[in-house]
Amino acid sequence: MGYSLVNILGGLLIVTSTIVVVSKTIPSAIKWYAIQSVVLVGVLLTLGLTTGATELLMWAASAFVTKVILVPFILNRAYKKMGSPADSTLTSSIKPAWTIILTGLEVAVCFAVVTRLSLPTAEVATPALAISFAHFFVGLTCIISQRNILKQIFGYCLMENGSHVTLALLAPTAPEIIEIGIATDAIFAVIIMSAVVVRIWNDTKSLDSHDLTELKG
């Protein structure tokens, strides 16, 4: 039952990731990212209880603090500093329907790759492992397709969540210091990227990447 629940939660991860990418407003994307992070915590807890790896329980606690609370808080604070800019509703370069189809293809390709791996985890948690791999491509899709530069930050966050699940599945007994390093990198990356976005907004009053092609350092 343990790995079956992990696979179910993995399915919820890709659903929430897709919703984050197709969300039309920053507040909506923040909300769904927080929901996804709660699901991620559930994956870590379930894996910890299933494998007996107490390290994953610590990972779950760390992920709750950093991903469910801190990252949404930082992104929401950056959004409010810009006075809820109107161009937060900029549409993606890819229509939502095509985004969903592309996400499905990315998961299918990763699933095909995972089924060829001779790893213990690949035998019992194939869907979850494939979905964790697919998050890299889903995040990349978000970064490439979104015109809103604040929305592009979510692409990085999705990629980071995917790497988190991949590590938990492949190395559940890895020392907590590794998790601390991953979480710390993610927090500082989001802080720096958010600060840069706010600075760009203050200088240009635009979050549209199409308007920022002539920015100079």
Language model features by range: what are they?
Residues 1-217:
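Alpha-helical transmembrane segments of multi-pass membrane proteins predominantly involved
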